[in-house]
């Protein structure tokens, strides 16, 4: 697993807003959008491109365009908070949706939605989830995406736990793990007894969408 922690003062400032328990939803969502923009920007740095020729008002010059249409896959529900930023940077991307609910006793995910293209071969795939905690949800999604032909997947997370990174390394086939990239704003200290990331930022889904 290739880990890239985005080290940038603006990313650190946005992450600070997200961590602060006093941040209300109307400030949390814009801060997440800003940070997701920076994370996706870094995550797409190695996107394959192809040369094109364009004509400016003055001359003909060389340019580039994407070699294949990307696929972004937010993990519902928290990953939806990162989707607008991803689509703003990748307007031609296809969107897959994976809905998971966490069992609060076992901390294991149960899928309730898997709207994913049948053939992902040749498409750069970006899995969006603010929290990489135990790695259980990410592993479920990654196995699904791999079964549909995806290779060289990139996980885009706000914060990751060391336990989650270890789970990805050990829970995937060696070749898939070697091709996997994780882009995050921070790797935090640990998981607590209820499998929440410490210091983390709480329940990202609740902080984005509220809890009635």
Give names to the regions the model predicted:
Residues 1-212:
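PRPP-associated nucleotide enzymes
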């Amino acid at each position: 697993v290739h880990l890239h922690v985005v080290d940038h003062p603006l990313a650190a400032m946005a992450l600070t807003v997200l961590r602060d328990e006093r941040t209300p939803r109307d400030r949390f969502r814009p801060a997440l959008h800003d940070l997701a923009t920076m994370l996706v920007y870094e995550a797409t740095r190695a996107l394959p491109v192809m040369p094109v020729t364009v004509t400016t008002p003055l001359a003909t010059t060389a340019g580039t365009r994407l070699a294949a249409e990307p696929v972004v896959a937010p993990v519902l529900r928290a990953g939806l908070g990162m989707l607008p930023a991803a689509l703003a940077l990748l307007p031609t991307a296809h969107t897959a949706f994976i809905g998971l609910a966490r069992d609060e006793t076992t901390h294991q995910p149960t899928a309730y939605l898997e709207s994913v293209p049948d053939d992902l071969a040749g498409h750069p795939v970006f899995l969006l989830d603010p929290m990489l905690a135990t790695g259980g949800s990410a592993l479920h999604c990654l196995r699904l995406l791999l079964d549909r032909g995806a290779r060289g997947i990139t996980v885009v997370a706000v914060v990751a736990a060391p336990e989650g990174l270890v789970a990805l390394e050990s829970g995937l086939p060696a070749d898939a793990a070697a091709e996997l990239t994780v882009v995050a704003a921070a790797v935090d200290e640990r998981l607590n007894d209820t499998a929440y990331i410490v210091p983390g930022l709480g329940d990202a889904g609740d902080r984005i969408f509220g809890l009635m």
